[in-house]
Amino acid sequence: MDKVIEMFSDYLAHVRRHSENTLKAYKKDVRKFLTYVGKQINNIERKDVEEFLKALSKGDITGESPRETTISRYISSLNSFFNYLELSGMIYENPMERIKHPRIRRKIPDFLTEDEVSSLIGAFNEENELRQKTAISLLYYAGLRISELCNLRTTDISFIPPFLRVEMGKGRKDRLVPLPDKVIPILKKYIDLENPKIFVFENGKKHVHPSTVFRWLKEGVKRANIKKDVHPHTLRHSYATHLIRKGVNIKVVQELLGHTNLSTTSIYLHVADQEKFDAVKKL
């Protein structure tokens, strides 16, 4: 089993050009499936996949009932795996045929107000918490994913003109994110004082771990007395929502966020629509 999974992983990395996070997730999903089924690969049938997905949805695989997005990811993982096996001649019938993704209910993302963002960033002391303040500032002012922040390298920063180069992976073109004036002084001060060598936020020779940034964020939220469940992605949602509110074209927001599909970005239009409904309720 391990050999086939590693061959599959190499295929995803070098042919499909998937990101490291996707590789880890797909390998983990496939390993759980094969362990559950307990069959030789060429003996696996569609009913085995259906039984696994049923057990997964009941919480028998992970210990809790997963969201539709998690089930959909498992299906994507297994689709990729069996497509690879078929291309490689290891199987002749694909058990994933006619296996459909669950219908996912799209949830309007939570976001912070501009005042809450200011309070959050202002909760960090620039003299002895410059690292934390800079990291949280970039999550918002550059709309970064937590993985993008942690993997950010010193060579990805330009001050003239001011922008970040964000690696997109999956064979996609890197995106350039312009930096607003508010974040430039603090980023420049951090780079000048800390002088990071490879990664902007280093931990020895490696980059800082996402859990560390999450801990910084939670501390800032507590100090700012923000009564919302705030995660690193909340700042990215806030960045997109505020841009849409200010009248920025949705296609521009799509490029800034690095979304492949415009439909992914369009969820932020619903945030503005919801505001309208909330407004008329006050009449």
Curated annotation (Swiss-Prot):
Gene3D superfamilies hit by this protein: 1.10.150.130, Intergrase catalytic core
Pfam families: Phage_int_SAM_1, Phage_integrase
Subcellular location: Cytoplasm
Keywords, alphabetical: Cell cycle, Cell division, Chromosome partition, Cytoplasm, DNA integration, DNA recombination, DNA-binding
Keyword Ligase (UniProt): no
An MF annotation (GO) of this entry: DNA binding
GO biological process, any: cell division
Top-level division of the source organism's lineage: Bacteria
Core-binding (CB) domain residues: 1-86
GO terms under cellular component: cytoplasm
Protein family: Belongs to the 'phage' integrase family.
NCBIfam families recorded: recomb_XerA_Arch (NF040815)
Name of the protein this chain belongs to: Tyrosine recombinase THA_404
Organism: Thermosipho africanus (strain TCF52B)
